[in-house]
Regions:
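A broad, low-specificity signal for short, low-complexity segments enriched in glycine/proline
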Residues: 1-3, 47-48
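Active-site-proximal beta-strand elements of phosphoester/diester hydrolases
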Residues: 3-15
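Cys-nucleophile CN-hydrolase/nitrilase-fold catalytic domain and related Cys-dependent amidase chemistry
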Residues: 17, 26-78
Length: 78
């Protein structure tokens, strides 16, 4: 049996995508430096959690997977 170190990142999100990505980046790197090989970050970490109601004002937060800059960034980090 192989051992796998897992980390679950807990972070406070703000309404600033760049700041949230930078925080997640720092915490992922910290977890990896501590030996984690599987690192989980919060869903919808790019911004404030907005899924309490289905409000049209939040629909523009959705972005396609293809070419998504955050997905590309964390894929390269992996």
């Amino acid at each position: 049996m192989r051992q796998l170190t897992v980390a679950a990142v807990q972070m406070r999100m703000v309404d600033d995508v760049s700041a949230n990505v930078a925080t997640a980046d720092r915490l992922v790197r910290e977890a990896a430096a501590r030996g984690a090989r599987l690192i989980l970050i919060p869903e919808l970490f790019e911004g404030l959690y907005f899924c309490t109601d289905q409000l049209a004002e939040h629909f523009d937060r959705a972005r396609p997977l293809a070419g998504h800059p955050t997905i590309t960034f964390f894929s390269s980090l992996a």
